[in-house]
A protein has these predicted regions:
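SAM-dependent methyltransferase
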Residues: 134, 154-224
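A conserved beta-strand element that flanks and buttresses the S-adenosyl-L-methionine
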Residues: 122-124
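Conserved class I S-adenosyl-L-methionine
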Residues: 2-63
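C-terminal lobe and adjacent flexible extensions of AdoMet/dcAdoMet transferase-like proteins
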Residues: 218-256
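A short acidic, Gly/Pro-enriched loop at the edge of an enzyme's catalytic core
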Residues: 110-120
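A short glycine-rich, Lys/Arg-flanked "PGG" loop and its adjoining helix->strand segment in the class I
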Residues: 137-149
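Class I SAM-dependent methyltransferase SAM/SAH-binding core
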Residues: 66-111
Length: 256
């Protein structure tokens, strides 16, 4: 594998999310998020958002539909939006195979076509914070506008309190057969940006991408969400557990 990888062209790094969330992202999807973990996460979202059968629900940054389709199976009426045609194609195929009716839309979460349509919306598993602060706040305003009065918005993200303050990058490796996805993650403490330099070794070739996202603490989320039109903001830990400062996740649930 090494000899062939050296001969492959190394693309330039990119900060564009639609380059990062591509076929390689899809290929390693079930390794990073096994089906049993996705089942558990869908159950947690259902509970946190107080969903019932027939609830109209929007997922922003739905990817390949691993959560969207599961919630549709549970009886909610799902709409999924994503910027990646590759991931949406997989989401639609899986929905058809599972016999669920999901509306999948190619689009940008900073500009949504819906107003007062959904009972709930959510951004799950690091789908928030990929823009500058102004555009991140715009995403929250657009989400609020898409919700009916009393609607709920859920955001699942990294708990900024638990992010190591040292400068040395942290390495995460996912392996599928002989292929590897290697993430080197580092954090800019002063800006709150978390950078991911991703190395893909697949089919004997090497590809590199780069992306960063913004980490926010609970106080920042509360301020932005109230400014966007939400009346209350609650914090939870991973998959709806009690929030702790040293836990890995911060789950926000805001009510309009």
């Amino acid at each position: 594998m090494t000899d062939r990888a050296i001969k492959c062209r190394l693309p330039n790094s990119s900060d564009e999310p639609d380059v990062y969330f591509n076929d390689d992202y899809l290929y390693f999807g079930d390794v990073v998020n096994p089906p049993e973990a996705s089942d558990r996460q869908a159950d947690a979202i259902w509970k946190l958002l107080s969903l019932v059968q027939g609830s109209p629900v929007l997922e922003l940054g739905c990817g390949y539909g691993r959560i969207t389709n599961r919630l549709a199976k549970k009886g909610a009426r799902l709409t999924g939006l994503d910027i990646s045609p590759i991931l949406l194609k997989k989401a639609k195929a899986d929905a058809a195979e599972s016999g669920v009716d999901v509306e999948y839309v190619l689009g940008d979460m900073r500009s949504l076509p819906w107003r007062d349509r959904f009972d709930a919306a959510f951004l799950w598993y690091l789908t928030f914070g990929y823009f500058g602060d102004a555009d991140n706040e715009r995403v929250l305003r657009e989400a609020a506008s898409s919700l009916r009065k009393g609607g709920r918005l859920l955001i699942d993200h990294v708990n900024s309190f638990a992010v190591p303050s040292h400068e040395a990058p942290i390495c995460y490796v996912a392996q599928r057969n002989d292929d590897l996805r290697i993430d080197m993650v580092s954090t800019e403490v002063l800006t709150g940006r978390r950078h991911c330099d991703r190395l893909i070794v697949r089919n004997g070739c090497v590809r590199r991408t780069h992306l960063y996202y913004r980490l926010y603490g609970f106080a920042e989320y509360a301020r932005m969400l109230r400014s966007a039109g939400f009346e209350s903001v609650d914090a939870y830990g991973e998959e709806g557990a009690a929030f702790t400062s040293d836990g890995p996740r911060l789950v926000i649930v805001a009510h309009k």
